[in-house]
């Protein structure tokens, strides 16, 4: 990769933190100056790091106060982007930071109408790790609505009733 020609998102996606630091030095910029840059699709550098499973970079960006709740042109926020990698080492640590920072679980993507929480549930239910299921239980406290259907006609309630744990079902029923 030609660091000189590559944009910051490309460097994050295909490079290392060292490559990003090299690019910043070459341009005479600081991380604070570019931390919230988005690409033509509205995807932030933090989101690029989540897509690429560069959780070490995500941790640095979050430690330097990268903006959360960035919504891409497709309607996705950070939880949508980390969801497909949520079962990878280090992903839940980042997801917990995102939750603590107030990243919305209810933002819906434009393509499917899936909330960030729905998307996380889909992926965590595939592996069903204790840590992942515990994270969903923690998230559930911030879920305001679970009966609205996505474009395929499925709701969070339906997903939890079909594939969720008994504890998630109990949590949901205790709120109705």
What are these regions (language model features)?
Residues 24-34, 59-67, 96-105, 134-146, ...:
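Ankyrin repeat domain, specifically the short helix-to-loop turn at the C-terminus of the second helix
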Residues 145-176:
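Leucine-rich solenoid repeat scaffolds
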Residues 2-10, 33-48, 71-84, 108-123, ...:
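Ankyrin-repeat boundary/"N-cap" motif
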Residues 14-21:
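Helix-turn-helix repeat elements of alpha-solenoid scaffolds
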Residues 106, 112-145:
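Conserved binding-pocket/active-site segment within a compact domain
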Residues 19, 56-57, 90, 94, ...:
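Conserved ankyrin/ankyrin-like repeat signature
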